[in-house]
């Protein structure tokens, strides 16, 4: 990643009303993006958003900036991030823009872009947009101004796309599913997809009011889903995050099934069906149990840096078609171009239907290792704790004790002065003790 002023690993994000998530900045961003992206002749930009109240304000600002650059905006209304990627491809638009802060609270928001082929923008294009931001806005002639229109069938188009990734010969008619849409962008999509495929659906987190997105619901907080699955005696639960690019599941016993387990199920099923090409990509945080389970199946496994952007880069580098983060970003390049919670969830449901197995049983081939994470705050500017000899010494001792049946990972937070200490192994008590021993060494620096 180069040093960029505004763009992070997943677009531009922050608290609404604080720079850069302000109406004036976003208007200029729309103009700058329009100047850079007007390359392919369609002069159309798809704009989607999640259910945050600030989405309307930022949508208007973007549209004004794009119009000034001579590009027309096509609004989808509340729509999952992967749906915008899909619609950008099918409309052959210059680009797609998503107004969302994903799993963050309602008072945050962000802007991220998709290129004409439905993938994240290359670094060079983001850098060109930033360079354009330094210039004064110049408006095209009145006759060339962009227009605004709405894609009235956006939801229906995406629902049909999702359903098409589920095998025609299978049905969900025997499954009772609780779906939690985080009061976010999937609220009018996911329940309909599942119902149209035959499932008995109980929907929660499907009443967005602009300020309740991700609030004690969704992929980042599955407690409400776990309780409802047990209360309804459902076969499983499926949770999405606010913009629908993550999925976490819950089995009939209320156990959480994370992105690592979801990828294991999909990869194993792909192998059984003779459809898996190459291996699977996880991250530095992926559970060691995933790596060992895939190894037993003869499926190669590689780790990327944390972040779906880096997972995709590693997949492209190796020519592999499946990758995931344990947080629930699952990328299936045979189906789509980006992480898609609904599509990933459907592949797990297909494995359940095809094999007549419960979600719990599908997970049984993978033993999750206890993974303890301790965050240690340090004083910024006081040197790098990870380079201190005492920290290195304790880390080496722990690694030697764990041997090949465990891992230690120390990494800095990208957003605040925190060291994240992760220790993983077979014995939870031992792993906890080791994690706190390393954390104490970091604190003592």
Curated annotation (Swiss-Prot):
Binding-site positions, Mg(2+): 102, 241, 243, 245
Keyword Amino-acid biosynthesis annotated: no
GO cellular component: cytosol
PTMs per UniProt: Activated by phosphorylation.
Ranges in coiled-coil conformation: none
Signal peptide (from-to): none
Co-factor requirement: Mg(2+)
Catalytic residues (positions): 102 (phosphoserine intermediate)
GO biological process: carbohydrate metabolic process; peptidoglycan biosynthetic process; UDP-N-acetylglucosamine biosynthetic process
Class of enzymatic activity (EC top level): isomerase
EC id: 5.4.2.10
Superkingdom of source: Bacteria
Pfam families on file: PGM_PMM_I, PGM_PMM_II, PGM_PMM_III, PGM_PMM_IV
Phosphoserine, modified sites: 102
Keywords linked to the UniProt accession: Isomerase, Magnesium, Metal-binding, Phosphoprotein
Catalyzed chemical reaction(s): alpha-D-glucosamine 1-phosphate = D-glucosamine 6-phosphate
Family: Belongs to the phosphohexose mutase family.
Function: Catalyzes the conversion of glucosamine-6-phosphate to glucosamine-1-phosphate.
Protein name: Phosphoglucosamine mutase
């Amino acid at each position: 990643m180069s040093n960029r002023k505004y763009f992070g690993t997943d677009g531009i994000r922050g608290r609404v009303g604080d720079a850069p998530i302000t109406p004036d900045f976003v208007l200029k961003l729309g103009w700058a993006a329009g100047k850079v992206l007007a390359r392919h002749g369609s002069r159309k930009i798809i704009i989607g958003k999640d259910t945050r109240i600030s989405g309307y304000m930022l949508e208007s600002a973007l549209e004004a900036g794009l119009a000034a650059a001579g590009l027309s905006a096509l609004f989808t209304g509340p729509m999952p991030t992967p749906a915008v990627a899909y619609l950008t491809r099918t409309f052959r638009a210059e680009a797609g823009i998503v107004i969302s802060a994903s799993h963050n609270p309602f008072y945050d928001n962000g802007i991220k872009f998709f290129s004409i082929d439905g993938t994240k923008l290359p670094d060079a294009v983001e850098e060109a947009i930033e360079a354009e931001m330094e210039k004064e806005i110049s408006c095209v002639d009145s006759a060339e101004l962009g227009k605004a229109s709405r894609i009235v069938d956006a939801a229906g188009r995406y629902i049909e796309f999702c359903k098409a990734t589920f095998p025609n010969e299978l049905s969900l008619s025997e499954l009772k599913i609780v779906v939690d849409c985080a009061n976010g962008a999937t609220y009018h999509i996911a329940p309909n997809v599942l119902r149209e495929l035959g499932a008995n659906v109980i929907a929660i987190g499907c009443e967005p009011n602009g300020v309740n997105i991700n609030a004690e619901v969704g992929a980042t907080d599955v407690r409400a889903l776990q309780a409802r699955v047990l209360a309804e005696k459902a076969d499983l639960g499926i949770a999405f995050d606010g913009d629908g690019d993550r999925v976490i599941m819950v089995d009939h016993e209320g156990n959480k099934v994370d992105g690592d387990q979801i990828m294991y199920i999909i990869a194993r099923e792909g192998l059984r069906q003779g459809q898996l090409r190459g291996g699977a990509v996880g991250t530095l945080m992926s559970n060691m149990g995933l790596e060992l389970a895939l190894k037993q199946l003869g499926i190669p496994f590689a780790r990327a840096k944390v972040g779906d952007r880096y997972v995709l880069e590693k997949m492209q580098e190796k020519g592999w078609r499946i990758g995931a983060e344990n947080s629930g970003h699952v990328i299936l390049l045979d189906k789509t171009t980006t992480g898609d919670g609904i599509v990933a969830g459907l592949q797990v449901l297909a494995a359940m239907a095809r094999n007549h197995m419960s979600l719990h049983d599908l997970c049984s081939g993978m033993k999750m290792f206890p993974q303890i994470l301790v965050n240690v705050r340090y004083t910024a500017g006081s040197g790098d704790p990870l380079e201190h000899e005492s920290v290195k010494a304790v880390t080496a001792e722990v690694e030697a004790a764990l041997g090949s049946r465990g891992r230690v990972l120390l990494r800095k937070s990208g957003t605040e002065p925190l060291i994240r200490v992760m220790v993983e192994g077979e014995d939870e008590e031992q792993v906890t003790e080791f994690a706190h021993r390393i954390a104490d060494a970091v604190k003592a620096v």
